């Protein structure tokens, strides 16, 4: 559904050269045109408008001086830097244009009719006047010569036994004679010049020759291969014309045929059989076809026609028509009229071999015209709310309009057709009213069609794919308002212009147009502002007058208008973009500037250009024919095949067969560039896959439809997720819930978006939502899709972050909140109509309220539905069975203890009555409480079952106690009985025994104690070491003193095992009355002062000499050994860490990936403990047996959990060293209180030297560690491992090593090792008396 649009014309008038032009060729590398005349060759530069070279063939004797000579062909030879020329007299001349040297490389005595080079310029084919073909090499050596007329069909002759042919068919009463009709041959057309025509296939493997048969006088087409072997001869086609063109893609050979009432362009296959045709818009004998030409990519067929002279016709014209095909229909896209006399008479025309859309035309008056055509889609602007998404397709004198908002009609069909008197060259829609159309035809008239409420159909408007008897048109069709003729300033200038004087006709407002014309004398363009003016003589004929004109330096190749900003962007051939200010009092142009104030210039000329606002900035978007996409002067992508701007969205299709949609309102240039160039992965809302080769036709405004066209011509409608969600959000903002719901249901958008888009607004308008939907099925569908997930954060995040809304439900129970709100609204509106939806609201809650649902169904039973909208109990129950599993529903009904409800549910289910009736009958015979107990136990509702069973009486207590033990219901059971009851006593004892089995001795003791089971409580407290409670129980049991003393010694032993020496000493002193053993336990636990208190309390000063002082001195020695060991370990690890860091900074990090980052091999290495075992410092009464040995076991357990090894050269040795150093510092830090305590008793017993020695050693160790901490835990050292090394001095290896190093960064679990340990400087551990 594309049209051909003229982007640029290049014209060179009045070329100063001798003679009259006869033919021409293109010199692509030089950018010049070589024209042949009866005098010689002339090379012109159409851009600079100058004659570069003139070569006379008359002076060399190749052409006669009387001007009767003729050049039949010119071919530029690229690799030889020369030109091959053939004359009608038979000379084949090679001409070096730069040196003007001529060389005759061959001569045909009989003369040459046609010269044709193969596409690869390896073979030369000459048709002579003696009806022969001569094939030569590129070196002009004759390969072979054959007669044009061949009796044989060719190598591709069909082999058949005749089945299905005319010879074997029955012909009715006429008999057999009709089977063999007389072959009738029509002679060639009267205007046929009888010259042979030669055309090559695009790959140069075959060529076809059209020649007038010497026997029949009719034209035939013969196909030869590259080896000059005849392949096939065409079937006899009456009225076959001389024109011949082989499609470069190789599928068809085009020619013409005169039929009794029409003239067709027909197509032959390589085997000579006809394969399709299309009819030219002329009557028989009205025109003749001079030539057919395919463009380079086989997409356009140019037909050069000329009026045949008739009586009474003084003005004859010639036409160049451009035809394209789609969906097997041929469209006439352009019709360019030329004169057949004077300077505008066409001599020859050629398609450019490099640029597919460039057509070169040579006219008789030494005029050269070059037209660049590009594909465009003429669609409505889509800016107004009532825009119908019209797309107009040019087809000769018809404009095929498809209204995509109402129907998707595949081409070549359409919604309606506009009939124009002359072939259409351009169609445009109004920038403000997209349904209004203006059509420019080949006679430079503009037909304006407007859509209004007129009931009558216009005679020039015909319905297309719709219609019929009684059919009512569901849309407003346009009517012809008036036709306007563009008025020129000079009548002579009007007759002496190129066929398309005005280009880029743009309808900017109701009565104003913009158009572009070019200057013939200089590279300038003129922007015309055209306004409508009525005609006094004819109401149906108006005029377009030029109200103002602005001259622009440069060739304009693009013009677009933005209706929102009323800005017009003008693109020049050099890529510069200008802004045309047509609303200003004096029309002017200025450079289009970007946000930085720099003029915008495309790097390459763009064939499609549009203006749009991106993030509030007005930008120009351009797409080149090489798929490069620009926004202002920035190339954002190089794989874009088509794009369209609709509302606030930019849609593009790419070479990777995707369609991407971007919101422009909150977008930026960098974001679009990142999304299009693939530097960031587009979200699912932005990107969707499309069929290979899809191109955007249009986007339906205020809708979700995106129309794509496939390469073969068929259409596909897709609903791009971004467009869908944007439209749904608009509907929800306007409280148009029904439209949003229908769209979401049809396109399978999660219905949670209705609430999540704006929860507060939805909950405030629940009644509006229900009234608009007004369908029980649709409401139920909405309920079934509800979930706690916020889809605006997961599935459908908004393109622009919206303002944070206060949560309407801080507990996160979204589903419950919606169900409750909608249920209240439905019960208010019409509870009978929405009965099923109300039931669904109960079922869909987080905890389904099946009991309430069953109760409501039970209430419906027995009611007669008088109202038509009411629902019976049976219908409600059937519906519930769709939502809930039948077994679950049966169980819930059983849990209501209502057997009528249970039977109703069971009857509607698939259950066998033999299964449930005996069970229900058994239950009915039971006592009420026991019945409910049995039901709850069956339903595994054990707490309720226990409650009912406890009410059944003492005779059921044994069963009750078994239930309590089986289901661990002790806490619930204790709430059901009085504390003074025997049942409470029995449950408590069972509970305590259960806790003992679980090794929870202290809670078990408390339970036993509360219920009076003191002996069991004593055992439990004794097992857990709770000596206070154990002694309390002993008192309540009134135990004898000796038993109490034995109990105390047992408790003391357990406390010692738990390293609670002070508490063990208290028990021995107060309950076992053994103060001596108590003192020894205190000395073992380093409680020096408490031990002295007992010594003096019981006046046993002798113990000081025998036990206290030796223990103190032993402890001091152990402390000194421990400090020496830890200091040496600290220094050794610190020095090794320094070495490790130096090696790490020196060695390359290229192979770091091969290291074991997670310590998988560390189990193979031996671990080195940094703390000595307690046995090295043990003494009989020293604290090392308790505290230091406990620390050693703790370190061993920690070492077992460590992943890092201290072995030299291990992968993470540095981290292991940090861990070891941190442990040393922490162990020293924890000794401060202990050192302070022993310093006091050392001073007390006059061991001042030992005390000072210990104090100095401890202070020295602390200073050593405090000084080394900043060097060990350095900030730069930690950052260097994770910061990539970048910069001008970096290399590939260094950058890779830096990034690979980040892979081995410290795991989260080991991050504590990178933090320096804390040393409390405020701790007062010193003894000032020793200083």
Swiss-Prot record:
Homodimer; dimerization promotes ELP1 stability and elongator complex formation. Component of the elongator complex which consists of ELP1, ELP2, ELP3, ELP4, ELP5 and ELP6. Interacts preferentially with MAP3K14/NIK followed by IKK-alpha and IKK-beta. Pathway: tRNA modification; 5-methoxycarbonylmethyl-2-thiouridine-tRNA biosynthesis. One of its GO terms (biological process) is tRNA wobble uridine modification. InterPro entries: A-sol_ELP1, Elp1, ELP1_b-prop_2, ELP1_N_b-prop_1, HB_ELP1, TPR_ELP1, WD40/YVTN_repeat-like_dom_sf. The modification Phosphoserine is found at residues 803, 1170, 1173. Keywords: Cytoplasm, Nucleus, Phosphoprotein, tRNA processing. Residues 1167-1176 have a biased composition (Polar residues). It comes from Rattus norvegicus. Residues 1193-1205 have a biased composition (Basic residues). PANTHER family: ELONGATOR COMPLEX PROTEIN 1. One of its GO terms (cellular component) is cytosol. GO terms for molecular function: ATP binding; protein kinase activity; tRNA binding. Component of the elongator complex which is required for multiple tRNA modifications, including mcm5U (5-methoxycarbonylmethyl uridine), mcm5s2U (5-methoxycarbonylmethyl-2-thiouridine), and ncm5U (5-carbamoylmethyl uridine). The elongator complex catalyzes formation of carboxymethyluridine in the wobble base at position 34 in tRNAs. Regulates the migration and branching of projection neurons in the developing cerebral cortex, through a process depending on alpha-tubulin acetylation. ELP1 binds to tRNA, mediating interaction of the elongator complex with tRNA. Residues 884-1331 are annotated as: Mediates dimerization. Phosphorylated. This is Elongator complex protein 1. The keyword Magnesium does not apply. Its main location: cytoplasm. Residues 1190-1208 are annotated as: Required for binding to tRNA.
